[in-house]
């Protein structure tokens, strides 16, 4: 039996490989979801704590619509992990009984497919669209260092740094500086990438508006696309992150198909 749809001031919390989100239906809220309230709700000490908020919206030429709100109150164009969480939420809470449907985001419309086992969602596959990969490497001067990177868009911006020597300490130092670098007037997501073999990459992630995260679907797609374009990997690609692994397939037309889990945590009522 599905869980009930969200009622007045309720939310659902889920994570995808440790990347956690709150899911909210704005129509049920008794107060406006302002940037100030978003920052409070996402705060790990003063609020519920999350890497962002997903809101259920009317679909734009799609079955459902999704907005992705960052912990700093800004809005993201697309989130691979957020999409998987959102798609499972729709099925688990009875908004749809279909296993295939479409979702519109500010970064474009995506198609989703749910893999069920015993009536429960096991994995979610999302066609993330095509990646736009920079034709040549670029260089940014950051903290006295020249950092070579690949510029990628998968509906949202990414700065992919392919360098096996980079550590988590480097990510925490370079991530916020690259995110706000003048080369990225709208800010950017940052990935530090190591190519493990011809079908595997390992990445550390700094998300625009959120900071370090354990996993990111769109970052995985961007990093894999950059490595594929440079001839470092071939499809299929496994993206290994601190929170877990994602499977990526690059279709002949350039579409990126992402498959991974999403895990419900709890449902509650907002009092803040």
Across the structure, where does each feature detected by a protein language model lie?
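A glycine-rich beta-to-alpha transition motif near the start of alpha/beta enzyme domains, typified by
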Residues: 1-120, 160-272
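Short secondary-structure junctions
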Residues: 8, 137-139, 146-149, 258
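Extended Gly/Ser/Thr-rich low-complexity repeat segments
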Residues: 137-144, 267-272
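Short, solvent-exposed secondary-structure boundary/capping segments
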Residues: 120-128
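Glycine-rich, charged/polar anion/phosphate-binding loops
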Residues: 134-136, 144-148, 177-179, 189
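Internal active-site segments that recognize and position negatively charged phosphoryl groups
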Residues: 141-168
């Amino acid at each position: 039996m599905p869980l009930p749809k969200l009622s007045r001031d309720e939310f659902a919390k889920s994570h995808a490989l440790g990347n956690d989100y709150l899911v909210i239906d704005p129509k049920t809220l008794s107060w406006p979801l302002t940037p100030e309230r978003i920052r409070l709700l996402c705060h790990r000490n003063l609020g519920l704590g999350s890497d962002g908020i997903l809101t259920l919206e009317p679909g734009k030429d799609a079955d459902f619509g999704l907005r992705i709100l960052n912990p700093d109150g800004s809005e993201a164009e697309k989130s691979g992990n957020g999409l998987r969480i959102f798609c499972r939420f729709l099925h688990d809470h009875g908004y749809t009984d279909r296993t295939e449907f479409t979702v519109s985001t500010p970064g474009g419309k995506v198609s989703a497919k749910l893999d069920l086992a015993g009536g429960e969602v096991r994995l979610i596959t999302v066609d993330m669209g095509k990646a736009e990969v920079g034709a040549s490497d670029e260089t940014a001067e950051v903290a006295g260092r020249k950092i070579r990177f690949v510029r990628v868009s998968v509906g949202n911006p990414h700065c992919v740094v392919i360098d096996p020597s980079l550590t988590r300490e480097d990510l925490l130092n370079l991530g916020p500086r690259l995110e706000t670098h003048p080369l990225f007037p709208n800010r950017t997501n940052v990935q530090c990438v190591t190519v493990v073999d011809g079908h595997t990459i390992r990445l550390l992630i700094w998300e625009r508006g959120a900071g370090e995260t354990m996993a990111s679907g769109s970052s995985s797609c961007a990093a894999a696309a950059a490595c594929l374009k440079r001839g470092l990997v071939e499809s299929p690609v496994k993206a290994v992150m601190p929170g877990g692994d994602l499977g990526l397939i690059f279709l002949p037309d350039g579409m990126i198909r992402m498959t991974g889990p999403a895990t419900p945590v709890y449902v509650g009522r907002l009092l803040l």
